[in-house]
Amino acid sequence: MRPLTPLAALAALAALATVTACGGSPAADTATGGDGGPKGAKGTVTVRIPDPGNSGVLALGKKDGSLDEALAAVGAKVAWTGSAGPFAPAAQAMNADQLDIATGSITSGITSLSQSPGFAFFTATDPDPVGEGILVREGSDIASVKDLVGRKVAVNKGGTGEYLLLKALAGAGIPADEVERVYLRPDQTAAVFNAGQVDAWAVWSTYAVAEIGSGKARFLADGTAIGSDNYSLNAVRSKFAEEHPEIVKALYAYLHENSAKERKDPAAYLNVFTDAGPTAVNGKAKEVQIAFTAKAGTVDPIGPEDVKRFETVARFYADQKVTPNKVDIAAHLLDVEKLS
């Protein structure tokens, strides 16, 4: 991805997302006698990030201390706050000054931006070509997107699942109202899907890996077949980005470098803390996850071509009545390489 040319929206840096001290507002570690900022080594700024769990770049960075080292270089430290999951609740937490950094899709980002956001996006990862899509059970008579007519499909409202389904239907020339959308939280959908209470499930790799790895499900259509523009983005609380741009830039640099390493050696980023229990990925599911990650994108700056595709998604959501109007996504983007 090429860096953004100056965007008019970026002139208002105060509208950008944040990383701040643990508590109600940005603050330094009072034990160090700091002034709230990372400069001058007087205080340490605390960055609140959802706990990454057992896999991924942040999980390994948490374990080996490399993330602490990268943040310490700019006078910051991480506080693991809550757990990683769907973007909508994370966006609400950033708006309420309870979280500073979160990861989500452009689709869930757009719906969250339609609700008085206090955050902005500062990185982009290309749409997942193979790890997201529409799942059907093995043995299902659903052989094409057109076979979804009259069926029930589980989706997360306003997020990746609803986008993938609507995009697939539009591509097949099927009116959206000819397929019943069943709105469910993704972490509550597997049991419903496997019990046959829905016919298909539009979802991303976090949940698809276990289903495909079990041998009980397959993708009817993946991201490539659907023509997905569903980028993964990192968001930062706006006031934090305004006050501590150098920390946002350092976090980006860490994510960029290590996401490239993860793509080259996916297995090294799995089962970081344990290879047993519900957070571990083993057997066929591990093979599936490694294959997905090897084809995934890296964490990059947001470039002009990316913005065009974001705008396409925003227009599509407005046309499909997912959002009441087209969200001005460009007003909530940060050129991370120009922060200083």
Predicted features and spans:
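Bacterial signal peptide processing site
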Residues: 23-26
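Secondary-structure end/capping motifs
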Residues: 242-322
